A protein has these predicted regions:
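Hydrophobic helix-and-loop "lid/oligomerization" segment in the mid-to-C-terminal part
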Residues: 7-133, 153, 206-343
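Short, glycine/polar-rich helix-capping loops at beta-to-alpha or helix-loop-helix junctions
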Residues: 122, 162-172
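Phosphate/diphosphate-binding loops
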Residues: 137-149
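Hydrophobic/aromatic beta-strand patches that form the interior of the parallel beta-sheet core
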Residues: 135, 156-160, 175-177, 224
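Short, ordered loop/turn segments at secondary-structure junctions
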Residues: 82-83, 111-113, 139-140, 162-165, ...
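Short alpha-helices
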Residues: 93, 169-211, 217-230
């Protein structure tokens, strides 16, 4: 019996200028710009204690009921994760959660780029052993066909995502956790997939009356920061705190990938991550396999992390070389294109 099962059993802007000559534009004043700037930089969250409750997510209670039932009965869980930096972040978050609680009847699938986007029927039909529960992270909100197939096969589906539903609406899954679905009362809509699934796992611990939030945040803060920057999330409220506070964690983090990244750096900021590290993580899925980036982030030793980082940087250098050659070929073949006002 895993530890998780055991817990379950126990339960400078100048002077104001009025733009009047353009009737189609609103009047812009210095005061209105100041108000907008203040609103955009507003920090309603300044500490972990101010994080909104997980149950504010629509669908969270239903997802918790399914998860608790699954682990109570040792059901097989399949986690389906996207392959970009945010998707790999959800993978690391999921790995760390299940490892921490000792639940082993779980499998992780990072979607391969050539297969298409997100959860698809193939992820069910190609498996020799049918899962009892499927959890998606950073994908799933548009997976109508796969969700319908899972339901027909008696598989529970828990969708955790941060993208907008498409024209078909929200899939008819067993539970959907997405701040953009109609009726969701979670106050911050601009969050990424790693944050959503991190919230789901926190909610599980909260349901079990475990004092887990502080430890869970400290453990995963670098990944929450990294993926928020990678997905170019608007920095307001929760996401702003995650980046501002999370960057500080890079100086004290015990994560091996963080130590390697910080090896030759006296300081780290969002730009360093956006242009120094994130392209190296994203390139894995584009030119090789997203699991290579995942291996870097979960490296058990500093030396292994260093080797993976070296490999990813070389892969990204190769991508840049290919891009330069492609740009040169296009400029030689279609020189007029480069003068086009929209290129």
């Amino acid at each position: 019996m895993s530890g998780l099962q055991s817990h379950i059993l126990n339960e400078s802007i100048g002077e104001s200028r009025e733009i009047k000559e353009y009737n189609a534009l609103p009047e812009i004043t210095l005061e209105s710009l100041k108000e907008r700037l203040q609103r955009d930089c507003n920090e309603p969250i300044t500490s972990l204690g101010q994080f909104p409750d997980p149950l504010l997510f629509k669908g969270m209670k239903e997802a918790l009921d399914i998860f608790i039932w699954a682990v109570s009965n040792n059901k097989r869980i399949l986690c389906i994760l996207d392959s970009d930096c945010d998707g790999v972040g959800t993978f690391i978050t999921s790995i760390e959660f299940f490892k921490y609680f000792g639940y082993q009847n779980v499998e992780f699938l990072i979607v391969k780029r050539h297969e298409g986007y997100g959860f698809i029927p193939k992820h069910i039909t190609d498996r020799q052993i049918k899962p009892d529960v499927i959890i998606t992270a950073d994908n799933g909100i548009t997976a109508h066909a796969a969700t319908e197939l899972a339901t027909q096969m008696g598989i529970y589906t828990i969708i955790t995502d941060h993208h907008q539903p498409n024209y078909k609406g929200v899939p008819k899954a067993s539970a959907v956790i997405d701040p953009h679905q109609p009726g969701c009362t979670f106050p911050f809509k601009d969050i990424n997939g790693t944050v959503v699934v991190w919230y789901f796992y926190w909610a599980i611990a909260q349901r079990l009356n475990l004092n887990f939030k502080n430890h869970w945040y400290e453990m995963m803060a670098p990944e929450l920061t990294l993926t928020t920057i990678a997905d170019v999330i608007k920095l307001q409220g929760l996401s702003r705190f995650l980046v501002k506070d999370g960057l500080k964690k890079f100086y004290t983090s015990s994560r091996n990938w963080v130590k390697v990244f910080m090896e030759d750096r006296k300081e780290v900021d969002a730009e360093a991550l956006a242009f120094g590290l994130i392209p190296c993580i994203n390139v894995a899925a584009r030119l090789a396999d997203a699991t290579h980036a995942a291996n870097f982030l979960v490296s058990p030793t500093y030396q292994i992390a260093k080797e993976w980082y070296k490999y990813l940087k070389q892969l990204n250098d190769h991508r840049k070389e290919k891009q330069e050659l492609l740009d040169k070929e296009i400029s030689n073949t279609y020189p007029a294109w480069l003068e086009h006002p929209f290129i």
